[in-house]
Amino acid sequence: MVSVPLRWYNIAADLPEPLPPLRDPEGLREESRIALLSRILPSRLIEDEYILARWVDIPGEVRKALARIGRPTPLIRAEGLEKVLGVKGRVRIYYKSEAVLPTGSHKINTAIAQAYYAKLDGAKEIVTETGAGQWGLAASTAAALMGLKATVFMTASSFKSKIQRRLLMEAQGARVISSPSKLTDTGREALEEYGSTHPGSLGLAIAEAVEYTLESGDRRYLPGSVLEAVLMHQTVIGLEALDQLPEEPDVVVACVGGGSNFGGFTYPMIGARLRGEGFEKTRFIAAESTAAPKLTRGEYRYDGLDSSLILPLAKMYTLGHRYTPPPSHAAGLRYHGVSPSLSILRRLGLVEAEAIPQEEALASILLMARSEGVVPAPESSHAVALAARIARKLPDGSVVAFNLSGHGLLDLDALQKALEIRGASMW
């Protein structure tokens, strides 16, 4: 019987080359951005970020909380999807469902650990950013579980369109602020430059959250993705999947925003491959949005993690820290960069990537709903779309596995759009 993992997996121990260190922006005359991390992040999170051990023990209180919220999550044979795609009897498809968690997505896995770390530091409030609201809801829930206040900067486009998830955050006691806002210098500058119609971006929301965190020593900033510690916390997904999969997949797919979902699902398998312990022929493919195609069209270089260069620079695939993605129903994928470890794997050819157009992703919401009875989040539907696209082309006997990172029951705007375009045959 599968149980909650005792340890996280840290891919840094198995990468073919060392992770490039974070850097300060050139010509910086102010406080070191790297030193700044010690003022805003939970101290234990910083330890997790730089640890080199392959296996890291999950604190008992965190593991207990993960069990309370419903881990381990199920791995499901998608027989209905196989039938609709016309591959039943030829290709087997499995998906790991993070949608069954109470907050509706994988984000709660690291939120619990980070809120616990903030509590250990004696913090009274956690601060973060969110796009579609999945991370904001997870952080708000984790804060409530740990007895902490929460402030969430939500990208303006999602603040208006993802009302239900915003209400759920507020139900957990969080204060939710539309970004860009007038609460910070960063937000005010963006509003002055672009006006009140600015859709916001994750990079901008991060900058606001960090600036707000710095105003009080009782606050800690919780990052939702990109940092290696966050990806490590998410490996509970892939570690469970290793115990659940009845056979080794030929193709493994997950959507990618900053990298935590993709890394969480695939890194335990990629790590096994790097150590020569299996998955030698498996293809690992990231499904990104055409609205933020960093892995397919970005540059591999040092760039800011946020739009205002408040945080350090990381070496990663990036579209540029000032890039403002167009509005998208998959707000959680609207980030300009991706984690350094995933960037290395992409550059070395160990990970492939494909950008999925919004219409194809939205149509895949209905594909999954009508074949499996599950409404995926707009972000997760990118993985569904790519898995479906690939499954049709695979030879007999092939196996596909993908991560369903969250449900779309609160993404009614995306569902409405999907229903409007359902006449377009995408499968």
From Swiss-Prot:
Q: What does this protein do?
A: The beta subunit is responsible for the synthesis of L-tryptophan from indole and L-serine.
Return the protein name: Tryptophan synthase beta chain 1
Q: What's the Enzyme Commission number for this chain?
A: 4.2.1.20
Q: In which pathway does it act?
A: Amino-acid biosynthesis; L-tryptophan biosynthesis; L-tryptophan from chorismate: step 5/5
The similarity annotation says: Belongs to the TrpB family.
Question: What chemistry does it catalyse, as a reaction equation?
Answer: (1S,2R)-1-C-(indol-3-yl)glycerol 3-phosphate + L-serine = D-glyceraldehyde 3-phosphate + L-tryptophan + H2O
How does the record describe its quaternary structure? Tetramer of two alpha and two beta chains.
